[in-house]
């Protein structure tokens, strides 16, 4: 059997590579214009020496992939760039593609991907679906199980028939029940808080309290990834101890540092450097997952969204789903996120339900790609893919209606 090509087409970052790789290649899914008007595609962003006032454009807007003109250039950068990745796509006609797309993709937009894959790149076959649909096929022991009291137990390998996948990415957070490998779209819920929202809120908070950083997208994203954490117990508990968790971030001076860094204890401060002292900002911003009212968003938080999702599945499955929650997506790299989710959800559930959250041991952003890798070795993949000859015979409408569209499950 041929080794398929896996592409986890995230809105922030594309994870891609042949299925025989242990870890994927990674490329940012964006086009960046620096303050001098020069354009940098994908990972070329790392070559920018002055990160101030950079403008970033992404192919995805409001969770939908709407700009294939830009996305195709980024795919070319990924697939035909041996100088950076040490690998390139040779003959796409002999390559099978497994790709991801966002949940509830509008059918007309979903057809665009079919046309690009089969008509522009001419792949031999394709299988695409949301990342959550691949997760139950992950048989590797890459998870820690966090219980409702915060305890951690060893994960067991094997296919799980009932899982509640919480995919928290850059655009938003999806909560999707997957029952025997089939997504239960009737109960799928969306929380409009993701990495992009956290960046925006952190910008506003720092600009109001310290310096104007509304045009410093790259800097703020770096501060979020290095410094922010979820309150392990509660917001009020962390607020009382904010002095203990205070962080001093040395802002870039574009001579000794291009993106800034966290000052370590007893580390000398350069005389010409500016210091950003962060206290409650570090945990107030991630806390919006559980309490959106902090940012004046009058919508349910993550726990309420999960409970609403669970209430829409058959009653006999509800405790099974709650005890098999899988946390994937880059936002679960935020410290204490999965543990806090388990404890908060346990308080809201009936006493005879046991909440368990499966947390990736390493990088949660890569867990979707690793699940796709496991899926590529199953008979389910062989039976569900669409070949190029089938596409040319039936057309894009047939692919969306009978194979890839979510409407057939509703």
Swiss-Prot record:
<dbReference type="InterPro" id="IPR043129">
    <property type="entry name" value="ATPase_NBD"/>
</dbReference>
<keyword id="KW-0805">Transcription regulation</keyword>
<protein>
    <recommendedName>
        <fullName>Actin-like protein ARP6</fullName>
    </recommendedName>
</protein>
<keyword id="KW-0539">Nucleus</keyword>
<comment type="similarity">
    <text>Belongs to the actin family. ARP6 subfamily.</text>
</comment>
<dbReference type="GO" id="GO:0005737">
    <property type="term" value="C:cytoplasm"/>
</dbReference>
<keyword id="KW-0010">Activator</keyword>
<dbReference type="GO" id="GO:0000812">
    <property type="term" value="C:Swr1 complex"/>
</dbReference>
<dbReference type="InterPro" id="IPR004000">
    <property type="entry name" value="Actin"/>
</dbReference>
<keyword id="KW-0156">Chromatin regulator</keyword>
<comment type="subunit">
    <text>Component of the SWR1 chromatin remodeling complex.</text>
</comment>
<keyword id="KW-0804">Transcription</keyword>
<keyword id="KW-0963">Cytoplasm</keyword>
<comment type="function">
    <text>Component of the SWR1 complex which mediates the ATP-dependent exchange of histone H2A for the H2A variant HZT1 leading to transcriptional regulation of selected genes by chromatin remodeling. Involved in chromosome stability.</text>
</comment>
<dbReference type="Pfam" id="PF00022">
    <property type="entry name" value="Actin"/>
</dbReference>
<dbReference type="GO" id="GO:0034399">
    <property type="term" value="C:nuclear periphery"/>
</dbReference>
<keyword id="KW-0206">Cytoskeleton</keyword>
<dbReference type="GO" id="GO:0006338">
    <property type="term" value="P:chromatin remodeling"/>
</dbReference>
<dbReference type="GO" id="GO:0005856">
    <property type="term" value="C:cytoskeleton"/>
</dbReference>
<dbReference type="GO" id="GO:0031491">
    <property type="term" value="F:nucleosome binding"/>
</dbReference>
